[in-house]
């Protein structure tokens, strides 16, 4: 099994047009998104290894925030997760696996975390 590097960003809060109920379809819904991307890596990271041998965390953050279309309504949050995964796969051929966790903040009570985790592998 090849070595991989897991890059992670957690608990990004965004507002996206999503939902199936009438009270959800007109206003952006608050979501908390976490992303993990597994990428191919060199055999070793020397002290002077350039960033190009890895991947910037900013790429993951962008895919889960500014990379999401603001004018598109996603019926399901699974569609939001797929959009994030697709963005990361398209942007870097070294990305092997993407895991996206989305929590719907509008329906959570107290300390609940209600949402989904989608895992996609490069095909």
Regions found by a protein language model. Give the residues of each.
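N-terminal, polar/charged subdomain of small-to-medium soluble alpha/beta proteins
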Residues: 1-123
């Amino acid at each position: 099994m090849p070595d991989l590097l897991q890059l992670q960003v957690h608990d990004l809060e965004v507002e996206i047009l999503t939902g199936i109920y009438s009270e959800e379809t007109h206003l952006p819904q608050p979501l908390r998104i976490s992303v993990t991307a597994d990428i191919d890596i060199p055999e070793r990271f020397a002290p002077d290894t350039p960033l190009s041998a890895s991947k910037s965390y900013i790429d993951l953050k962008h895919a889960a925030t500014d990379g999401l279309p603001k004018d598109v309504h996603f019926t399901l949050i699974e569609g939001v997760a797929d959009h994030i995964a697709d963005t990361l796969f398209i942007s870097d051929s070294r990305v092997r696996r993407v895991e996206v966790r989305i929590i719907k903040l509008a329906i959570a009570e107290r300390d609940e975390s209600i949402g989904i985790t989608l895992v996609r592998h490069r095909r």
